[in-house]
Amino acid sequence: MTISMISPSSIRLSSDKRDSSSSNLPANIEEDTQSVSSSDSGVSADSIDHHHHGHGHGHSHGGHGHSHTHNNDDSSSDCSGAGGGAHKHSHDEKYQKGRRAEKVLWAVAALSAVFIAAEFVGGFWAQSLAIMTDAGHMLSDLLSFIISIFAIRCARLPASKRLSFGYERAEVLGALTSVIILWVLTTVLVVVAIQRIVNNEHEVDADVMLITAGVGVLFNIVMGLVLHFGTGGHGHTHGGHSSHGHAHDGKNVNVRAALIHVIGDLVQSIGVLIAALIIRFTGWTLADPICTFLFSIIVLFTTVTVMRDIFFVLMEATPSHYDLSDVKKALSALEGVKGVHDLHLWSIGMDKTAFSVHLALESPNRAMENVAEARSLIRRRFGVAVATVQVEPFDEKIDSCDTCQQQETA
Protein backbone atom coordinates (compact mmCIF):
# COMPACT_ATOMS: atom_id res chain seq x y z
CA MET A 1 0.00 0.00 0.00
CA THR A 2 1.42 3.41 -0.95
CA ILE A 3 0.10 6.65 0.51
CA SER A 4 0.89 10.05 -1.02
CA MET A 5 -0.51 13.49 -0.29
CA ILE A 6 -0.36 15.42 -3.57
CA SER A 7 -0.77 19.16 -3.91
CA PRO A 8 -2.87 20.57 -6.78
CA SER A 9 0.12 22.25 -8.39
CA SER A 10 1.92 18.93 -8.76
CA ILE A 11 -0.80 17.34 -10.95
CA ARG A 12 -0.01 17.22 -14.69
CA LEU A 13 -1.93 15.78 -17.63
CA SER A 14 1.12 13.98 -19.00
CA SER A 15 2.33 10.98 -17.01
CA ASP A 16 6.00 11.80 -17.54
CA LYS A 17 5.80 14.75 -15.13
CA ARG A 18 4.39 12.86 -12.15
CA ASP A 19 7.80 12.69 -10.46
CA SER A 20 7.36 16.33 -9.38
CA SER A 21 4.52 15.39 -7.01
CA SER A 22 6.79 14.25 -4.21
CA SER A 23 8.43 17.66 -3.90
CA ASN A 24 5.36 19.07 -2.16
CA LEU A 25 5.13 16.32 0.44
CA PRO A 26 6.22 16.60 4.05
CA ALA A 27 9.42 14.70 4.65
CA ASN A 28 7.83 12.22 7.04
CA ILE A 29 5.12 11.27 4.54
CA GLU A 30 7.72 10.63 1.83
CA GLU A 31 9.77 8.45 4.18
CA ASP A 32 6.69 6.50 5.24
CA THR A 33 5.73 6.00 1.62
CA GLN A 34 9.14 4.60 0.76
CA SER A 35 9.15 2.25 3.72
CA VAL A 36 5.69 0.88 2.92
CA SER A 37 6.60 0.37 -0.73
CA SER A 38 9.67 -1.60 0.23
CA SER A 39 7.71 -3.77 2.65
CA ASP A 40 5.18 -4.57 -0.06
CA SER A 41 7.97 -5.82 -2.28
CA GLY A 42 8.98 -8.26 0.42
CA VAL A 43 5.77 -10.27 0.28
CA SER A 44 6.54 -13.85 -0.66
CA ALA A 45 5.22 -15.44 -3.83
CA ASP A 46 3.60 -18.10 -1.67
CA SER A 47 1.52 -15.47 0.03
CA ILE A 48 0.50 -13.73 -3.17
CA ASP A 49 -1.43 -16.78 -4.31
CA HIS A 50 -3.84 -16.30 -1.42
CA HIS A 51 -3.91 -12.52 -1.09
CA HIS A 52 -5.34 -9.58 -3.05
CA HIS A 53 -3.02 -6.62 -2.70
CA GLY A 54 -4.03 -3.10 -1.82
CA HIS A 55 -2.74 -0.19 -3.87
CA GLY A 56 -2.88 3.55 -3.65
CA HIS A 57 -2.61 6.54 -5.94
CA GLY A 58 -3.28 10.25 -5.83
CA HIS A 59 -5.30 12.50 -8.09
CA SER A 60 -6.86 15.97 -8.04
CA HIS A 61 -10.42 16.54 -6.87
CA GLY A 62 -12.18 19.87 -6.72
CA GLY A 63 -9.01 21.90 -6.28
CA HIS A 64 -7.53 20.04 -3.35
CA GLY A 65 -5.11 17.15 -3.15
CA HIS A 66 -5.83 13.75 -1.68
CA SER A 67 -4.91 10.12 -1.90
CA HIS A 68 -6.75 6.86 -1.49
CA THR A 69 -6.10 3.19 -1.02
CA HIS A 70 -8.00 0.12 -2.07
CA ASN A 71 -8.26 -2.94 0.12
CA ASN A 72 -9.54 -6.05 -1.59
CA ASP A 73 -8.10 -8.60 0.76
CA ASP A 74 -9.83 -10.84 3.23
CA SER A 75 -7.48 -10.23 6.11
CA SER A 76 -6.00 -7.09 7.59
CA SER A 77 -2.83 -8.89 8.61
CA ASP A 78 0.31 -9.03 6.49
CA CYS A 79 0.51 -12.14 4.34
CA SER A 80 4.09 -12.76 5.29
CA GLY A 81 5.30 -14.43 8.46
CA ALA A 82 2.97 -15.94 11.03
CA GLY A 83 0.02 -13.87 9.90
CA GLY A 84 0.47 -15.19 6.37
CA GLY A 85 0.31 -18.78 7.60
CA ALA A 86 -2.99 -18.14 9.34
CA HIS A 87 -4.30 -16.29 6.30
CA LYS A 88 -3.36 -19.18 4.00
CA HIS A 89 -4.98 -21.63 6.41
CA SER A 90 -8.19 -19.58 6.32
CA HIS A 91 -8.27 -19.58 2.52
CA ASP A 92 -7.52 -23.32 2.29
CA GLU A 93 -10.28 -24.05 4.78
CA LYS A 94 -12.71 -21.84 2.85
CA TYR A 95 -11.77 -23.65 -0.37
CA GLN A 96 -12.36 -27.08 1.20
CA LYS A 97 -15.71 -25.95 2.62
CA GLY A 98 -16.71 -24.74 -0.84
CA ARG A 99 -15.77 -28.10 -2.36
CA ARG A 100 -17.83 -29.99 0.25
CA ALA A 101 -20.78 -27.67 -0.31
CA GLU A 102 -20.55 -28.22 -4.06
CA LYS A 103 -20.68 -32.01 -3.67
CA VAL A 104 -23.67 -31.81 -1.33
CA LEU A 105 -25.53 -29.50 -3.71
CA TRP A 106 -24.84 -31.83 -6.64
CA ALA A 107 -26.27 -34.74 -4.63
CA VAL A 108 -29.40 -32.77 -3.73
CA ALA A 109 -29.78 -31.53 -7.31
CA ALA A 110 -29.66 -35.12 -8.59
CA LEU A 111 -32.32 -36.21 -6.07
CA SER A 112 -34.47 -33.22 -7.04
CA ALA A 113 -34.19 -33.96 -10.76
CA VAL A 114 -35.30 -37.57 -10.23
CA PHE A 115 -38.28 -36.60 -8.12
CA ILE A 116 -39.34 -33.68 -10.35
CA ALA A 117 -39.57 -36.06 -13.31
CA ALA A 118 -41.57 -38.54 -11.20
CA GLU A 119 -43.83 -35.77 -9.86
CA PHE A 120 -44.64 -34.37 -13.30
CA VAL A 121 -45.51 -37.89 -14.50
CA GLY A 122 -47.57 -38.57 -11.36
CA GLY A 123 -49.33 -35.21 -11.60
CA PHE A 124 -50.21 -35.77 -15.25
CA TRP A 125 -51.40 -39.31 -14.52
CA ALA A 126 -53.52 -38.21 -11.55
CA GLN A 127 -54.69 -35.04 -13.36
CA SER A 128 -53.64 -33.09 -10.26
CA LEU A 129 -52.71 -29.42 -10.65
CA ALA A 130 -51.54 -29.30 -7.03
CA ILE A 131 -48.86 -31.90 -7.75
CA MET A 132 -47.89 -30.11 -10.97
CA THR A 133 -47.55 -26.86 -9.01
CA ASP A 134 -45.39 -28.60 -6.43
CA ALA A 135 -43.25 -30.02 -9.25
CA GLY A 136 -42.92 -26.55 -10.76
CA HIS A 137 -41.80 -25.15 -7.42
CA MET A 138 -39.25 -27.94 -7.05
CA LEU A 139 -38.02 -27.23 -10.58
CA SER A 140 -37.33 -23.66 -9.50
CA ASP A 141 -35.43 -24.99 -6.49
CA LEU A 142 -33.42 -27.31 -8.74
CA LEU A 143 -32.42 -24.26 -10.77
CA SER A 144 -31.47 -22.54 -7.51
CA PHE A 145 -29.23 -25.49 -6.55
CA ILE A 146 -27.51 -25.34 -9.94
CA ILE A 147 -27.12 -21.57 -9.59
CA SER A 148 -25.56 -22.08 -6.15
CA ILE A 149 -23.08 -24.59 -7.59
CA PHE A 150 -22.32 -22.14 -10.38
CA ALA A 151 -21.82 -19.36 -7.81
CA ILE A 152 -19.38 -21.48 -5.76
CA ARG A 153 -17.35 -22.25 -8.88
CA CYS A 154 -17.43 -18.64 -10.07
CA ALA A 155 -16.15 -17.50 -6.67
CA ARG A 156 -12.94 -19.44 -7.40
CA LEU A 157 -12.42 -17.71 -10.75
CA PRO A 158 -10.01 -14.75 -10.80
CA ALA A 159 -11.12 -11.28 -11.81
CA SER A 160 -10.33 -10.15 -15.34
CA LYS A 161 -9.63 -6.82 -17.03
CA ARG A 162 -13.25 -6.65 -18.17
CA LEU A 163 -14.77 -8.06 -14.96
CA SER A 164 -12.68 -6.35 -12.29
CA PHE A 165 -15.01 -7.54 -9.50
CA GLY A 166 -14.97 -11.09 -10.84
CA TYR A 167 -18.20 -13.07 -11.15
CA GLU A 168 -19.82 -12.04 -7.87
CA ARG A 169 -23.13 -11.11 -9.53
CA ALA A 170 -23.47 -14.32 -11.53
CA GLU A 171 -25.53 -15.70 -8.63
CA VAL A 172 -27.81 -12.65 -8.78
CA LEU A 173 -28.45 -13.05 -12.51
CA GLY A 174 -29.06 -16.77 -12.05
CA ALA A 175 -31.56 -16.13 -9.27
CA LEU A 176 -33.37 -13.64 -11.50
CA THR A 177 -33.66 -16.26 -14.26
CA SER A 178 -34.94 -18.85 -11.78
CA VAL A 179 -37.67 -16.54 -10.46
CA ILE A 180 -38.85 -15.62 -13.97
CA ILE A 181 -39.15 -19.30 -14.95
CA LEU A 182 -41.09 -20.06 -11.76
CA TRP A 183 -43.49 -17.16 -12.40
CA VAL A 184 -44.20 -18.39 -15.94
CA LEU A 185 -44.94 -21.95 -14.74
CA THR A 186 -47.11 -20.72 -11.87
CA THR A 187 -49.10 -18.42 -14.17
CA VAL A 188 -49.88 -21.29 -16.55
CA LEU A 189 -51.05 -23.54 -13.68
CA VAL A 190 -53.19 -20.77 -12.16
CA VAL A 191 -54.95 -20.25 -15.52
CA VAL A 192 -55.72 -23.98 -15.74
CA ALA A 193 -56.91 -23.99 -12.10
CA ILE A 194 -59.34 -21.14 -12.86
CA GLN A 195 -60.71 -23.09 -15.82
CA ARG A 196 -61.25 -26.16 -13.63
CA ILE A 197 -63.05 -24.17 -10.94
CA VAL A 198 -65.30 -22.49 -13.52
CA ASN A 199 -66.15 -25.71 -15.37
CA ASN A 200 -66.08 -27.98 -12.29
CA GLU A 201 -65.79 -30.98 -14.60
CA HIS A 202 -62.55 -32.77 -13.89
CA GLU A 203 -61.46 -36.06 -12.36
CA VAL A 204 -58.51 -36.55 -10.04
CA ASP A 205 -57.01 -39.98 -9.34
CA ALA A 206 -56.79 -39.66 -5.56
CA ASP A 207 -54.73 -42.84 -5.10
CA VAL A 208 -51.99 -41.77 -7.53
CA MET A 209 -52.07 -38.26 -6.06
CA LEU A 210 -51.77 -39.69 -2.53
CA ILE A 211 -48.80 -41.90 -3.42
CA THR A 212 -47.01 -39.11 -5.30
CA ALA A 213 -47.53 -36.62 -2.47
CA GLY A 214 -46.31 -39.17 0.11
CA VAL A 215 -43.16 -39.86 -1.91
CA GLY A 216 -42.67 -36.08 -2.20
CA VAL A 217 -42.69 -35.68 1.58
CA LEU A 218 -40.16 -38.53 1.91
CA PHE A 219 -37.85 -37.08 -0.78
CA ASN A 220 -37.83 -33.64 0.84
CA ILE A 221 -36.97 -35.12 4.23
CA VAL A 222 -34.06 -37.05 2.70
CA MET A 223 -32.78 -33.93 0.87
CA GLY A 224 -33.04 -31.89 4.07
CA LEU A 225 -30.97 -34.48 5.96
CA VAL A 226 -28.34 -34.53 3.19
CA LEU A 227 -28.03 -30.73 3.30
CA HIS A 228 -27.98 -30.62 7.10
CA PHE A 229 -25.33 -33.28 7.69
CA GLY A 230 -23.49 -33.31 4.36
CA THR A 231 -21.15 -30.37 4.99
CA GLY A 232 -20.06 -31.29 8.50
CA GLY A 233 -20.52 -29.44 11.73
CA HIS A 234 -18.15 -27.10 13.51
CA GLY A 235 -16.15 -24.88 11.19
CA HIS A 236 -13.69 -22.12 12.03
CA THR A 237 -11.29 -19.65 10.49
CA HIS A 238 -8.15 -18.07 11.88
CA GLY A 239 -7.26 -14.47 11.24
CA GLY A 240 -3.81 -13.00 11.55
CA HIS A 241 -2.40 -12.36 15.01
CA SER A 242 -4.93 -12.94 17.76
CA SER A 243 -8.22 -12.93 15.89
CA HIS A 244 -10.15 -16.17 15.86
CA GLY A 245 -13.61 -16.40 14.35
CA HIS A 246 -16.02 -19.32 14.43
CA ALA A 247 -18.89 -20.38 12.26
CA HIS A 248 -20.56 -22.94 14.49
CA ASP A 249 -22.92 -24.35 11.92
CA GLY A 250 -20.01 -24.88 9.49
CA LYS A 251 -22.33 -24.51 6.51
CA ASN A 252 -21.78 -22.70 3.25
CA VAL A 253 -24.23 -19.83 2.63
CA ASN A 254 -25.49 -21.55 -0.53
CA VAL A 255 -26.16 -24.78 1.40
CA ARG A 256 -28.13 -22.85 4.03
CA ALA A 257 -30.19 -21.22 1.27
CA ALA A 258 -30.82 -24.63 -0.33
CA LEU A 259 -31.94 -26.01 3.04
CA ILE A 260 -34.51 -23.20 3.33
CA HIS A 261 -35.79 -24.09 -0.16
CA VAL A 262 -36.16 -27.75 0.80
CA ILE A 263 -38.03 -26.88 4.00
CA GLY A 264 -40.45 -24.81 1.90
CA ASP A 265 -40.90 -27.74 -0.50
CA LEU A 266 -41.56 -30.07 2.44
CA VAL A 267 -44.34 -27.81 3.71
CA GLN A 268 -45.84 -27.64 0.22
CA SER A 269 -45.66 -31.44 -0.22
CA ILE A 270 -47.45 -31.89 3.11
CA GLY A 271 -50.16 -29.54 1.80
CA VAL A 272 -50.53 -31.64 -1.36
CA LEU A 273 -50.76 -34.77 0.80
CA ILE A 274 -53.57 -33.21 2.84
CA ALA A 275 -55.43 -32.24 -0.36
CA ALA A 276 -55.01 -35.81 -1.65
CA LEU A 277 -56.45 -37.21 1.60
CA ILE A 278 -59.45 -34.84 1.32
CA ILE A 279 -60.14 -35.94 -2.26
CA ARG A 280 -59.58 -39.61 -1.41
CA PHE A 281 -62.05 -39.71 1.48
CA THR A 282 -64.58 -37.00 0.53
CA GLY A 283 -64.44 -36.90 -3.27
CA TRP A 284 -64.25 -33.08 -3.20
CA THR A 285 -62.05 -32.54 -6.29
CA LEU A 286 -62.09 -28.74 -5.96
CA ALA A 287 -59.49 -29.21 -3.22
CA ASP A 288 -56.93 -29.71 -6.00
CA PRO A 289 -57.28 -26.32 -7.82
CA ILE A 290 -57.81 -24.53 -4.50
CA CYS A 291 -54.55 -26.04 -3.26
CA THR A 292 -52.92 -24.78 -6.47
CA PHE A 293 -54.11 -21.23 -5.71
CA LEU A 294 -52.76 -21.38 -2.16
CA PHE A 295 -49.36 -22.61 -3.33
CA SER A 296 -49.25 -19.93 -6.03
CA ILE A 297 -49.78 -17.25 -3.39
CA ILE A 298 -46.97 -18.75 -1.30
CA VAL A 299 -44.69 -18.78 -4.35
CA LEU A 300 -45.54 -15.14 -5.07
CA PHE A 301 -44.74 -13.97 -1.55
CA THR A 302 -41.48 -15.92 -1.32
CA THR A 303 -40.22 -14.81 -4.73
CA VAL A 304 -41.21 -11.15 -4.34
CA THR A 305 -38.71 -10.83 -1.48
CA VAL A 306 -36.04 -12.46 -3.66
CA MET A 307 -36.83 -10.06 -6.52
CA ARG A 308 -36.60 -7.15 -4.10
CA ASP A 309 -33.13 -8.28 -3.00
CA ILE A 310 -32.06 -8.72 -6.63
CA PHE A 311 -33.34 -5.23 -7.48
CA PHE A 312 -31.38 -3.60 -4.65
CA VAL A 313 -28.18 -5.48 -5.52
CA LEU A 314 -28.39 -4.45 -9.18
CA MET A 315 -29.18 -0.85 -8.14
CA GLU A 316 -26.11 -0.91 -5.85
CA ALA A 317 -28.24 0.04 -2.86
CA THR A 318 -26.90 0.04 0.69
CA PRO A 319 -27.66 -3.38 2.24
CA SER A 320 -30.56 -3.22 4.70
CA HIS A 321 -28.46 -4.37 7.68
CA TYR A 322 -26.18 -1.31 7.40
CA ASP A 323 -26.92 2.17 8.71
CA LEU A 324 -24.78 4.79 6.94
CA SER A 325 -25.19 7.21 9.85
CA ASP A 326 -23.62 4.64 12.21
CA VAL A 327 -20.72 4.09 9.81
CA LYS A 328 -20.17 7.84 9.44
CA LYS A 329 -20.29 8.36 13.19
CA ALA A 330 -17.71 5.62 13.77
CA LEU A 331 -15.35 7.07 11.15
CA SER A 332 -15.80 10.62 12.46
CA ALA A 333 -14.70 9.45 15.91
CA LEU A 334 -11.24 8.45 14.63
CA GLU A 335 -8.39 10.65 15.81
CA GLY A 336 -7.53 13.41 13.34
CA VAL A 337 -10.64 12.97 11.15
CA LYS A 338 -12.42 16.31 10.72
CA GLY A 339 -14.96 15.33 8.07
CA VAL A 340 -16.49 12.30 6.33
CA HIS A 341 -18.16 12.56 2.92
CA ASP A 342 -18.81 10.59 -0.29
CA LEU A 343 -19.66 7.58 1.88
CA HIS A 344 -20.94 4.59 -0.09
CA LEU A 345 -21.82 1.00 0.84
CA TRP A 346 -23.15 -1.32 -1.84
CA SER A 347 -23.53 -5.02 -2.60
CA ILE A 348 -21.24 -6.64 -5.14
CA GLY A 349 -23.09 -9.94 -4.74
CA MET A 350 -25.65 -11.48 -2.41
CA ASP A 351 -23.21 -11.74 0.50
CA LYS A 352 -20.28 -9.46 -0.39
CA THR A 353 -20.22 -5.73 0.31
CA ALA A 354 -18.00 -2.93 -1.01
CA PHE A 355 -17.24 0.39 0.66
CA SER A 356 -15.70 3.75 -0.27
CA VAL A 357 -15.28 6.98 1.66
CA HIS A 358 -13.45 10.33 1.68
CA LEU A 359 -11.87 11.29 5.00
CA ALA A 360 -10.93 14.95 5.54
CA LEU A 361 -7.92 15.08 7.87
CA GLU A 362 -6.88 17.76 10.30
CA SER A 363 -3.22 17.10 9.53
CA PRO A 364 -1.49 15.06 6.79
CA ASN A 365 1.06 13.79 9.31
CA ARG A 366 -1.26 10.95 10.40
CA ALA A 367 -2.51 10.06 6.91
CA MET A 368 -1.20 6.50 6.94
CA GLU A 369 -2.43 5.86 10.48
CA ASN A 370 -5.88 7.22 9.62
CA VAL A 371 -6.16 5.00 6.55
CA ALA A 372 -5.11 1.91 8.52
CA GLU A 373 -7.51 2.70 11.37
CA ALA A 374 -10.42 3.33 8.99
CA ARG A 375 -9.78 0.12 7.06
CA SER A 376 -9.56 -1.90 10.24
CA LEU A 377 -12.75 -0.34 11.62
CA ILE A 378 -14.75 -0.94 8.45
CA ARG A 379 -13.61 -4.52 7.98
CA ARG A 380 -13.70 -5.72 11.59
CA ARG A 381 -16.73 -3.87 12.92
CA PHE A 382 -18.89 -3.80 9.79
CA GLY A 383 -17.60 -6.88 7.97
CA VAL A 384 -16.99 -5.20 4.61
CA ALA A 385 -15.02 -7.27 2.10
CA VAL A 386 -13.76 -4.54 -0.27
CA ALA A 387 -12.82 -1.15 1.19
CA THR A 388 -11.55 2.04 -0.47
CA VAL A 389 -10.42 4.80 1.91
CA GLN A 390 -9.47 8.18 0.44
CA VAL A 391 -7.84 10.91 2.54
CA GLU A 392 -7.51 14.63 1.88
CA PRO A 393 -6.83 17.87 3.78
CA PHE A 394 -9.86 19.24 5.63
CA ASP A 395 -11.68 21.96 3.68
CA GLU A 396 -14.76 23.63 5.15
CA LYS A 397 -16.17 24.27 1.67
CA ILE A 398 -16.03 20.60 0.79
CA ASP A 399 -17.31 19.57 4.21
CA SER A 400 -20.40 21.76 3.81
CA CYS A 401 -20.99 20.97 0.11
CA ASP A 402 -24.57 19.87 -0.46
CA THR A 403 -23.59 17.64 -3.38
CA CYS A 404 -20.96 15.81 -1.33
CA GLN A 405 -23.36 15.36 1.57
CA GLN A 406 -26.56 14.59 -0.35
CA GLN A 407 -26.55 10.89 0.48
CA GLU A 408 -26.57 11.78 4.18
CA THR A 409 -29.75 13.81 3.89
CA ALA A 410 -31.55 11.78 1.22
UniProtKB/Swiss-Prot annotation:
GO MF, one annotated term: zinc ion transmembrane transporter activity
Keyword check for DNA-binding: no
Induction pattern: By B.thuringiensis pore-forming toxin Cry5B. Isoform a: Not induced by zinc. Isoform b: Induced by zinc specifically in intestinal cells.
Keywords: Cell membrane, Cytoplasmic vesicle, Ion transport, Membrane, Transmembrane, Transmembrane helix, Transport, Zinc, Zinc transport
TM spans (from-to): 104-124, 130-150, 172-192, 209-229, 259-279, 281-301
Residue ranges annotated as Cytoplasmic topological domain: 1-103, 151-171, 230-258, 302-410
Family: Belongs to the cation diffusion facilitator (CDF) transporter (TC 2.A.4) family. SLC30A subfamily.
PANTHER family the record matches: CATION EFFLUX PROTEIN/ ZINC TRANSPORTER, LD05335P
Name of the molecule in the record: Zinc transporter ttm-1
Organism of derivation: Caenorhabditis elegans
